[in-house]
Design a protein with these regions (language model features):
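Positively charged n-region of N-terminal signal peptides that target proteins for export
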Residues: 1-4
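Hydrophobic alpha-helical targeting segments used for export or membrane insertion
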Residues: 9-10
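C-terminal motif of bacterial Sec signal peptides marking the signal peptidase cleavage site
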Residues: 13-16
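Predominantly soluble domains enriched in secretory-pathway, periplasmic, or organellar proteins
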Residues: 18-383
């Protein structure tokens, strides 16, 4: 693939700004993309996690208008930031005109201009995991305590309420242990609690926070070691359980309202392992890399579930056989207009990964090298 290097002068200037660090300059790869007339989606950001402790979280950008994949964008746009993005990128979202990049082990949410990727500021949140938004506020899950595996005395997690104008925390609500993804639905925030630091005594609940009073009003028993939670168009919540990596397998669960009441409960359990998923229309696209401690290996699967019928309709969405090129499927997203499918490959977790693009029929369009552990994607829309 044709590669265009940014001007040598820029690289020299960047290195000059970091006396003790060598900064990898931004790279541009040509990709076969174009924006059709009337199309609102003009780009996609990809946050590369970077292996824990390596301080190698990076930001890439897919430019649908110009047909470029832009690698390591943050360092070029923000040469004054000494340690760049930081350690372990765990989530990325766009709200209004800003990017919110969650940098887990750097205990912060980095706030950038969505058009330029230039730094606006940061929000300090300890061991922060995911962020969502509602009426001018950001809500971020936090483990609260330090990174400490196998800690039976780990503290309960929390959701931080942040004013998106001042970038200041205005309130905090205690939830379950090691909370992961959260979802705003109606007047409530639903939080998937994992208890990941407390294995084998995992948490098994979804916390329910009333937005107006910002208090936890309920804990719904669901399954152990929860991770992702998303709502479909019918008001149901889809939740993933990672299991215990041994005898209890990963699965996908459905929460819906109790008959005649506002409370949610588990209505369906699908024995489908799921590491990550996204919902497009009535279709839930999932990927699974299920680790087993006994076999010391991953079981890799893909598929589609109809969210209306709650039935699996396919055990694959890549139809041309090119999934064999993927070593570790790690992240997934669906283009909101073209319905192209994006799957990231973490490879060996310590070197560059790959982003694969497939059309809506599952035929590969292109692949491109990314940063280390490509994981989280969000789309940039026209103003």
């Amino acid at each position: 693939m044709k590669k265009l290097w940014i001007a040598l002068l820029m690289a020299v200037c960047l290195v000059g700004c970091r006396e003790d660090e060598v900064v990898v300059p931004t790279e541009y790869d040509v990709i076969p993309e174009e924006v059709k007339p009337g199309q609102k989606c003009i780009g996609m950001y990809l946050l590369n996690e970077g292996n824990m402790g390596s301080n190698k979280c990076t930001l890439d950008f897919v430019d649908f208008v110009q047909g470029y994949y832009v690698r390591n964008l943050y360092a070029e746009r923000n040469p004054q930031v000494v340690k760049e993005l930081g350690d372990v990128g765990n989530d990325i979202q766009i709200y209004g005109s800003r990017i919110y990049a969650v940098i887990n082990c750097s205990n912060k949410i980095e706030v950038l201009d969505a058009r330029t990727a230039r730094r606006i500021g940061q929000i300090d949140v300890p061991n922060v995991r995911y962020v969502r938004f509602h009426k001018g506020y950001a809500y971020a899950t936090s483990y609260v305590g330090p990174v400490q595996l196998n800690n039976p005395n780990a503290v309960q997690g929390a959701v931080y309420k942040i004013d998106t104008l001042s970038l200041k925390t205005v309130a905090r609500c205690t939830v379950g242990y090691q909370p992961e993804e959260l979802c705003v639905l109606g007047q409530y925030i639903y939080v998937a609690n994992s208890g990941g630091y407390m294995a084998p005594n995992y948490d098994k609940t979804v916390s329910v926070i009333e937005i107006e009073g910002f208090k936890q009003v309920e804990k719904i028993p669901v399954a152990i070691n929860l991770h992702h939670i998303k709502a479909d168009a019918y008001g149901k919540l889809w939740v993933t359980s990672r299991g215990d990596y041994q005898g209890v397998h990963s699965k996908l669960l459905v929460l819906d309202k109790k008959m005649g009441r506002n409370e949610m409960q588990v209505t369906d359990t699908l024995d489908i392992p799921c590491s990550d998923f996204c919902i497009s229309g009535d279709s839930l696209y999932y990927i699974s890399t299920e680790w087993n401690n006994y076999s010391q290996s991953n079981a890799i699967t893909y598929g589609i579930v109809n969210v209306r019928t709650k039935q699996k309709v396919s055990d694959h969405f890549i139809t041309d056989g090119s999934e064999k090129e993927i070593t570790v499927p790690y992240g997934i997203a669906i283009h909101p207009e073209t319905h192209d499918i994006y799957v990231t490959d973490a490879k060996n977790y310590v070197s560059s990964g790959v982003l694969h693009c497939y059309n809506q029929y599952g035929i590969q369009k292109w692949s491109v090298r990314t940063g280390d552990i490509p994981a989280h994607l969000c789309f940039l829309m026209r103003k």
